[in-house]
């Protein structure tokens, strides 16, 4: 199965184009608290879990480098969600919506 991807450089444009998109950070809670993309919800990845997300929303998923978010997106798609992964993860994201803990 091909995993749909969004470029980290185009993520801000994508989110602006599709208002209401859900951004899901699948890293640990500790990693999320250190830094995350503004408006992202933190749902740590747990292989085989049943995702409980709004079915009518487009879902953008990211992790540290992209591998975990791709696995999560694969499972989300199998469960009927419209999801895509941020290529390269938060490591590659340089957009204006990056939030660091204070």
Model-derived segments and their meaning:
Residues 1-22, 28-58, 65-102:
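Rhodanese-like catalytic fold shared by cysteine-dependent sulfurtransferases
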């Amino acid at each position: 199965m091909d995993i749909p991807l969004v470029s980290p450089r185009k993520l801000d444009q994508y989110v602006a184009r599709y208002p209401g998109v859900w951004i899901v950070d699948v890293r640990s809670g500790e990693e999320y608290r250190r830094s995350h993309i503004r408006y992202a919800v933190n749902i740590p990845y747990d292989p085989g879990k049943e995702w409980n997300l709004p079915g009518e929303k487009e879902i953008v998923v990211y992790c540290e480098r992209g591998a975990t978010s791709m696995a999560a997106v694969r499972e989300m798609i199998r469960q009927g969600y419209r999801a895509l992964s941020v290529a390269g993860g938060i490591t590659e994201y340089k957009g204006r919506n990056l939030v660091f803990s204070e």
